[in-house]
UniProtKB/Swiss-Prot annotation:
Regions that span the bilayer: 19-39
Gene it is expressed from: psbL
Keywords tagged on the record: Chloroplast, Membrane, Photosynthesis, Photosystem II, Plastid, Reaction center, Thylakoid, Transmembrane, Transmembrane helix
Secretion signal, residue range per the UniProt entry: none
Domain of life: Eukaryota
Family per record: Belongs to the PsbL family.
Free-text function comment from the UniProt entry: One of the components of the core complex of photosystem II (PSII). PSII is a light-driven water:plastoquinone oxidoreductase that uses light energy to abstract electrons from H(2)O, generating O(2) and a proton gradient subsequently used for ATP formation. It consists of a core antenna complex that captures photons, and an electron transfer chain that converts photonic excitation into a charge separation. This subunit is found at the monomer-monomer interface and is required for correct PSII assembly and/or dimerization.
Subcellular location, record wording: Plastid, Chloroplast thylakoid membrane
GO CC field: chloroplast thylakoid membrane; photosystem II reaction center
Record bears the keyword Transmembrane: yes
Descriptive protein name: Photosystem II reaction center protein L
Subunit structure, interactors included: PSII is composed of 1 copy each of membrane proteins PsbA, PsbB, PsbC, PsbD, PsbE, PsbF, PsbH, PsbI, PsbJ, PsbK, PsbL, PsbM, PsbT, PsbX, PsbY, PsbZ, Psb30/Ycf12, at least 3 peripheral proteins of the oxygen-evolving complex and a large number of cofactors. It forms dimeric complexes.
Lineage start: Eukaryota, Viridiplantae, Streptophyta, Embryophyta, Tracheophyta
Record HAMAP family: PSII_PsbL (MF_01317)
Length: 40
């Protein structure tokens, strides 16, 4: 937390990485739901 002031770019990279992981998780969940819908 203390390094966020000295290096704000690092914090932005972490934020983008977190949003990317959430996006991939959302796509994965939607893919599973759609596959279950089509197979059933």
């Amino acid at each position: 937390m203390t390094q966020s002031k000295s290096n704000p770019n690092e914090q932005n990279v972490e934020l983008n990485r977190t949003s990317l992981y959430w996006g991939l998780l959302l796509i994965f969940v939607l893919a599973v739901l759609f596959s279950n819908y089509f197979f059933n």
